[in-house]
C-alpha cells in the first residue's frame, strides 16, 4: 500500500462531519513536525484550523485544504460504511475520499518526498488547513487569512486541493472563481381582502415588472476567463397561505455569480436603479460571500500544468466554473492561486470514491510543482 493511500484511509476513518475535525489535523501535524514545520493551532469558535510553515524566506508556496466533510446521507444506501475506508474494484470508497482527504494525504506525502530530496530547499512551504469549509465558513480559512494578513505574511503561490477534475484526473485546473453576491429583497404593499382590489396594493404584481427586467438584464459580457455575470432568483415568499388575502409584502431571494468584469458595488447600484425606476417601496439586504479572483497564466499555472502532464499524461484546461471555495479568502493575500485535485463526479454523493490508480500521480503532481517553484 502506498504511503498516500494509507494516509488517505487514516483520514477517511475519522468521522469529521463539519465542523468536527475528529483528530484529522493532529494526524497531519504529526507528519509535518518531524520535517521541521512550525505549527500554529488556530481555534476559532468550534472550528479547528492550523497554519504550518517550513522556511523563513520567499517564495512561499502554501497548500490549502479542509478536513471536514459533509454528512453521509442514508448510510444504508452506501455500498460500504462511509467512515470505513474500503478499496474495492480499484476504487477507494469513503466520505471525503474525493472532497478532500485524498488531496490532503497527497499534500503530506509530496512534501515528505520533496523535503527528503531537498532538505535545504530555497523558499518556504506552508499549509492552511481548516475544519470549516463545508459549513458556514466563518471561523475557518477566512480567520487564518486574517491572522496572516495582520502580520503581513503574504503568500506567493497557493494550491487548493479541491476536486477540480471533470472527466479524467488532470483535465481541469481552476485558476479563478466567480464572486457571489446575494440579495434579500422585500417589496411592500398593502394587505387586504382579495375581493376588494381597490383597497389593496399587491406587492407581487408590483414587483413582477422589475423582476422581469432584472432577469433580462445583461450585466456584463464576461471575459477570456469568465462567463457573463448571471442573476438568478432562488426563492419567492409571499402570502398568508389563504386564498382570499392579498399579501402585504413579498420576499425575493436572489444571487449574482459575477466575473471580474463587474464589481459588487456596481451590481448593487444597478439593481437599486431598476427597483427605483419601477417606483417600488422596498428593503434590500446584501451579502457578499466572495469576490471573484483570477490567476492568469504565469509561473504557478505553468508549473502545475507541466506537473499534471508529467504525472497523468493530460493537458489541463483552465476554468473558473463552479461554486465558491476557500480560495476566495486566500486570494486576498496570495499572488497566484489555483485549485487542483481528484475527480468531482462523486463529491457529496453516496458512495464517494477515488480511483486508487490516481492517488500516486496526484502526489507526484504536487511534488513536481514544488520542485518547479522551490528548487
Swiss-Prot record:
Q: How is the cofactor bound?
A: Binds 2 Zn(2+) or Co(2+) ions per subunit.
Task: State which Enzyme Commission number(s) the record gives.
Answer: 3.5.1.18
Look up the domain of life of the source: Bacteria
**Xref: Gene3D superfamilies:** Zn peptidases
Which reaction(s) does the protein catalyse, per the Swiss-Prot or TrEMBL entry?
A: N-succinyl-(2S,6S)-2,6-diaminopimelate + H2O = (2S,6S)-2,6-diaminopimelate + succinate
The UniProt keyword set, sorted, is: Amino-acid biosynthesis, Cobalt, Diaminopimelate biosynthesis, Hydrolase, Lysine biosynthesis, Metal-binding, Zinc
User: What is annotated as the active site?
Assistant: 68, 133 (proton acceptor)
Name of the molecule in the record = Succinyl-diaminopimelate desuccinylase
Organism expressing this protein natively: Methylobacillus flagellatus (strain ATCC 51484 / DSM 6875 / VKM B-1610 / KT)
Q: Which gene encodes it?
A: dapE
Amino acid at each position: 500500500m502506498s504511503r498516500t493511500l494509507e494516509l488517505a484511509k487514516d483520514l477517511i476513518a475519522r468521522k469529521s462531519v463539519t465542523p468536527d475535525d475528529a483528530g484529522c489535523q493532529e494526524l497531519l501535524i504529526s507528519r509535518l513536525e518531524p520535517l521541521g514545520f512550525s505549527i500554529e493551532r488556530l481555534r476559532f469558535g468550534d472550528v479547528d484550523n492550523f497554519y504550518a510553515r517550513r522556511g523563513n524566506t520567499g517564495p512561499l508556496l502554501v497548500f490549502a485544504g479542509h478536513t471536514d466533510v459533509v454528512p453521509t446521507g442514508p448510510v444504508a444506501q452506501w455500498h460500504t460504511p462511509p467512515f470505513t475506508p474500503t478499496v474495492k474494484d480499484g476504487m477507494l470508497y469513503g466520505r471525503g475520499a474525493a472532497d478532500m482527504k485524498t488531496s490532503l494525504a497527497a499534500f503530506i506525502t509530496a512534501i515528505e518526498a520533496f523535503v527528503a530530496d531537498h532538505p535545504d530547499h530555497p523558499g518556504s512551504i506552508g499549509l492552511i488547513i481548516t475544519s470549516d469549509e463545508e459549513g458556514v465558513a466563518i471561523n475557518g480559512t477566512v480567520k487564518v487569512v486574517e491572522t496572516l494578513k495582520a502580520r503581513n505574511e503574504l503568500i506567493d503561490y497557493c494550491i487548493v486541493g479541491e476536486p477540480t477534475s471533470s472527466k479524467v484526473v488532470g483535465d481541469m485546473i481552476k485558476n479563478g472563481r466567480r464572486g457571489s453576491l446575494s440579495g434579500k429583497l422585500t417589496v411592500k404593499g398593502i394587505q387586504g381582502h382579495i375581493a376588494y382590489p381597490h383597497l389593496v396594493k399587491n406587492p407581487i404584481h408590483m414587483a413582477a415588472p422589475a423582476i422581469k427586467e432584472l432577469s433580462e438584464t445583461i450585466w456584463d459580457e464576461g471575459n477570456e476567463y469568465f462567463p457573463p455575470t448571471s442573476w438568478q432568483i432562488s426563492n419567492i415568499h409571499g402570502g398568508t397561505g389563504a386564498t382570499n388575502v392579498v399579501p402585504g409584502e413579498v420576499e425575493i431571494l436572489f444571487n449574482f455569480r459575477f466575473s471580474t468584469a463587474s464589481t459588487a458595488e456596481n451590481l448593487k447600484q444597478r439593481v437599486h436603479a431598476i427597483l427605483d425606476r419601477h417606483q417600488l417601496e422596498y428593503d434590500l439586504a446584501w451579502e457578499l460571500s466572495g469576490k471573484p479572483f483570477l490567476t492568469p497564466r504565469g509561473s504557478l499555472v505553468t508549473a502545475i500544468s507541466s506537473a499534471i502532464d508529467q504525472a497523468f499524461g493530460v493537458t489541463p484546461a483552465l476554468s473558473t466554473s463552479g461554486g465558491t471555495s476557500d480560495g476566495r479568502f486566500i486570494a486576498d493575500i496570495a499572488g497566484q492561486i489555483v485549485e487542483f485535485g481528484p475527480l468531482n463526479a462523486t463529491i457529496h454523493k453516496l458512495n464517494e470514491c477515488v480511483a486508487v490508480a490516481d492517488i500516486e500521480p496526484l502526489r507526484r503532481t504536487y511534488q513536481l510543482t514544488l520542485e518547479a517553484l522551490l528548487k
